[in-house]
């Protein structure tokens, strides 16, 4: 099994390190043709407008949508969730539009208002998961086929739709590998 981490911008290294701790072969994906070399893909946190601009400049956006629509398992964190969303509230931004959610960018505040909390994620075990929110998006609406796996303050923060796992916080910034392990089970 080889897992790609989209390497255009953001928390690339942190996701690669988490995967290495789990003994998984990784590929930092920087070219459209590399999307065919991976069994699953992580879209890291970062800056979503920069990420989509780079994807378009590299002609990778359409290939990525095609691969996701054909079943490529994807794990998106923070800005990656914005990239995948079908709708972005109060903001005009290009997106991939493959996940049936509406998001609000930077909903929990600016960088200085970043915070940590614990969330319950029954799908990965009974122990609470340390969730780090940094300029995180808020999922304000989910489609009928979107499964909510975790919430914070009544808002979904971890959702799954088919082959897509989307997390508004940053699990790669913790030592807890349960969400990465959960994604690997989706890939198998």
Curated annotation (Swiss-Prot):
Catalytic reactions of this protein: aldehydo-D-ribose 5-phosphate + D-glyceraldehyde 3-phosphate + L-glutamine = pyridoxal 5'-phosphate + L-glutamate + phosphate + 3 H2O + H(+); L-glutamine + H2O = L-glutamate + NH4(+)
Pathway(s) this gene product operates in, as recorded in its UniProt entry: Cofactor biosynthesis; pyridoxal 5'-phosphate biosynthesis
SUPFAM superfamilies linked to this entry: Class I glutamine amidotransferase-like (SSF52317)
Gene Ontology process terms (BP): glutamine catabolic process; pyridoxal phosphate biosynthetic process; pyridoxine metabolic process
Active site: 78, 170, 172
Residue numbers binding L-glutamine: 46-48, 105, 134-135
Entry EC no(s): 4.3.3.6, 3.5.1.2
Job description of the protein: Catalyzes the hydrolysis of glutamine to glutamate and ammonia as part of the biosynthesis of pyridoxal 5'-phosphate. The resulting ammonia molecule is channeled to the active site of PdxS.
Family designation: Belongs to the glutaminase PdxT/SNO family.
PANTHER family on file: PYRIDOXAL 5'-PHOSPHATE SYNTHASE SUBUNIT SNO, PYRIDOXAL 5'-PHOSPHATE SYNTHASE SUBUNIT SNO1-RELATED
Record protein name field: Pyridoxal 5'-phosphate synthase subunit PdxT
Gene name linked to the record: pdxT
